[in-house]
């Protein structure tokens, strides 16, 4: 079982999602100004 590889993939996916969410929130905050 390659749990380490799966965890690494999930970890990278979470980082990408976090970056996208932060970018989206930045646009929303900028638009609300």
Swiss-Prot record:
Query: Per its UniProt record, what Pfam families does this chain match?
Result: Inovirus_G7P_2 (PF19978)
Q: Where in the cell is it found?
A: Virion; Host membrane
Highest taxon, organism lineage: Viruses
Membrane topology listed for this record: Single-pass membrane protein
Q: What is its main location?
A: virion
The protein's UniProt keywords, in alphabetical order, are:
Host membrane, Membrane, Transmembrane, Transmembrane helix, Virion
- Report the transmembrane regions from the record: 10-30
Disulphides: none
**Which terms in the GO cellular component ontology are assigned?**
host cell membrane; membrane; virion component
Q: What does this protein do?
A: May initiate with G9P the virion concomitant assembly-budding process, by interacting with the packaging signal of the viral genome. The assembly-budding takes place at the host inner membrane. In turn, G7P and G9P are present at the end of the filamentous virion that emerges first from the bacterial host.
- Name the family: Belongs to the inovirus G7P protein family.
Name this polypeptide is given: Tail virion protein G7P
């Amino acid at each position: 079982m390659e749990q380490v590889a799966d965890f690494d993939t999930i970890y990278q996916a979470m980082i990408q999602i976090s970056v996208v969410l932060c970018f989206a929130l930045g646009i929303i905050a900028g638009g609300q100004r």
